Amino acid sequence: MQGKIIKGIAGFYYVYAEDGNTYECRAKGIFLKDKFKPLVGDDVDITVLDGKELEGSVTEIHKRKNSLIRPAVANVDQALVIFAMDNPKPNFMLLDRFLIMMERENVPAVICFNKKDLATEEELEFLYETYRSCGYQVIMSSALKGEGLGEIEEVLKGKTTVVAGPSGVGKSSLTNSLQEEVEMETGEISRKLKRGKHTTRHAQIIPVAQD
């Protein structure tokens, strides 16, 4: 039976299969032996081991059109790279590294600067024009005030999008604002270090902006 890995946690892979069910699967040992790890987004074949408990085994991984290391995902159409305007302050060298990584894997990137309410109009305009002139679509948003969500929804429609960015920039808050099916844990900013604390520890496919 064919399906797609929609979540991976601690060696378990949750596969949404063609029969409409989601199976909790382990990967066959041959993948581990060959050091080829299944990724969220992989199209796979599974063998159903227990139809009642919805348990199975991943037996084959189909050819990938692309894959990323951080976050570890495969077969994405685009990336939404999220950075905050402040709290934490944007690390532009890190942003450039994210963009280079996406370019290397031929994954189109859209840049989202969240927490726009913490910046001046001059700062917003400067970053908008800087990255637009490099050919990137740029979205200014505020998860707190609900600004920019409509523009993000339009970008996400009909595409498998990987959300990337450092901790504390509002990735989970924006995801929660765009859908109600899954509640992502959100974290606080360290007052001492002015950095975000890791809250999202696994990759997962979440339906957003469906027609």
Where are these regions (language model features)?
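Conserved C-terminal guanine-recognition region of P-loop GTPase G domains, centered on the G4
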Residues: 68-138
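Switch I (effector-binding) loop of TRAFAC-class P-loop GTPase G-domains
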Residues: 65, 180-211
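N-terminal accessory targeting/assembly segments
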Residues: 1-92
